[in-house]
C-alpha cells in the first residue's frame, strides 16, 4: 500500500518535470532512442535516459558480462557473469521505469543488419557507445 502511494502515476518524474517543465517532459516521454553498445558508457547513458522518463528505447549489444567488466560496467556483478548485457540491463531498466517501451537486441552490429535496425525504429536520437571500430564505422556510414 505504501509503495503504491509513493509511486503514483509519474510522481517519480516530478523532480525532472520541475526542472524541465511539462512540455519538455512530454517530449521526452514520446522520444524513441536507440542505444548501441552497453559497456562502460552505453549502459550508463541508457540508464539515465530511462531515469529521465524516455518513452521508447532500443538497446543493442551482443556481449556477455565478463569478470574484466567488474571495475567499470553497470551490468557487471558476480550474479550476472556470463549473462547477456542487454538482458541484464533490460531487467534493470524495466524495474526503474516499468512504463518504458523497451526493445532488446542482443546482436552484434554488422554492415548487413544496420539498415534493418535503423529502419525498424524511426529513432529520434541514436547513442553510439560502440567500443569496436568496424561496427562504429558501419553505423556512422548509414
Regions found by a protein language model. Give the residues of each.
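Rossmann-fold NAD(P)-binding glycine/threonine-rich loop
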Residues: 133-142
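Hydrophobic residues within alpha-helices
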Residues: 45-46, 89, 139
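Glycine-rich adenosine-cofactor-binding loop
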Residues: 29-50, 56-61
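Glycine-rich phosphate-binding loop and adjoining beta1-alpha1-beta2 segment
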Residues: 54, 59-97
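Conserved acidic residues
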Residues: 106-108
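N-terminal charged helix/coil linker that caps or initiates catalytic domains
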Residues: 1-33
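Short amphipathic alpha-helix with an adjacent loop that forms part of the alpha/beta core around
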Residues: 112-123
Amino acid at each position: 500500500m505504501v509503495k503504491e502511494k509513493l509511486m503514483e502515476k509519474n510522481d517519480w518524474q516530478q523532480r525532472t518535470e520541475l526542472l524541465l517543465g511539462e512540455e519538455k517532459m512530454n517530449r521526452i516521454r514520446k522520444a524513441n532512442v536507440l542505444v548501441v553498445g552497453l559497456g562502460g558508457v552505453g549502459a550508463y547513458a541508457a540508464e539515465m535516459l530511462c531515469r529521465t522518463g524516455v518513452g521508447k528505447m532500443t538497446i543493442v549489444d551482443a556481449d556477455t558480462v565478463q569478470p574484466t567488466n567488474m571495475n567499470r560496467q553497470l551490468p557487471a556483478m558476480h550474479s550476472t557473469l556470463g549473462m547477456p548485457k542487454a538482458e541484464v540491463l533490460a531487467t534493470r531498466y524495466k524495474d526503474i521505469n516499468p512504463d518504458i517501451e523497451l526493445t532488446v537486441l542482443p546482436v552484434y552490429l554488422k554492415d548487413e543488419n544496420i539498415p534493418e535496425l535503423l529502419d525498424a525504429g524511426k529513432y529520434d536520437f541514436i547513442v553510439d557507445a560502440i567500443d569496436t571500430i568496424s561496427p562504429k564505422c558501419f553505423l556512422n556510414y548509414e
